[in-house]
Amino acid sequence: MNFGDITVVIVTFKSEHKIYSCIDSIPEESKIIIIENSNDTKFKQKIEAHRSNVECFLTMQNNGYAAGNNFGLKKVKTKFALVLNPDTRLLKNSLKEFYNTAAKNNDFWLIGPNQDFVNNVQNENTLEVDNIKGY
């Protein structure tokens, strides 16, 4: 398994107070692309200095979550991309499980995780669709 095959994309808007625990939960071998939907150059400098595997792009205005992800995903050069929110943290084996699932399944375009909520209750609802039009 090679964490270097994974780029994590995080879209944020002035979330400096939340994002460090997210970044610190990601192995240093993985590249991290942060899309900051503002013109906060101090944030960019601080976040890139925090970890050597972080690259931060400023959009200069809040273009929204979807546009931020589209922008970030275009910057990915690795085999796999993982989209995270700035207020999330990866559990110990999450990235390993993501990599193993992605590496052995060639017929996917999106993989979604189980989510642990308060009191470790998991959301195990699954929806399979042939076409995402209308969702």
Model-flagged regions — what are they?
Residues 12-28:
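Short, well-formed alpha-helical segments that are part of the catalytic scaffolds
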Residues 81:
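Short aromatic/hydrophobic "clamp" motif used to bind/position activated sugar donors
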Residues 59-76:
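Glycine-rich, basic loop-to-helix element that forms the pyrophosphate-binding segment
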Residues 4-10, 26, 30-35:
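Hydrophobic targeting segments
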Residues 43-44, 69, 93-95:
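Acidic donor-diphosphate engagement hotspot in glycosyltransferases and nucleotidyltransferases
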Residues 93-125:
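Conserved donor NDP-sugar-binding/catalytic core segment of glycosyltransferases
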Residues 36-45:
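A conserved acidic beta->alpha catalytic loop
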Residues 85-89:
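The conserved acidic donor/metal-binding loop of glycosyltransferases
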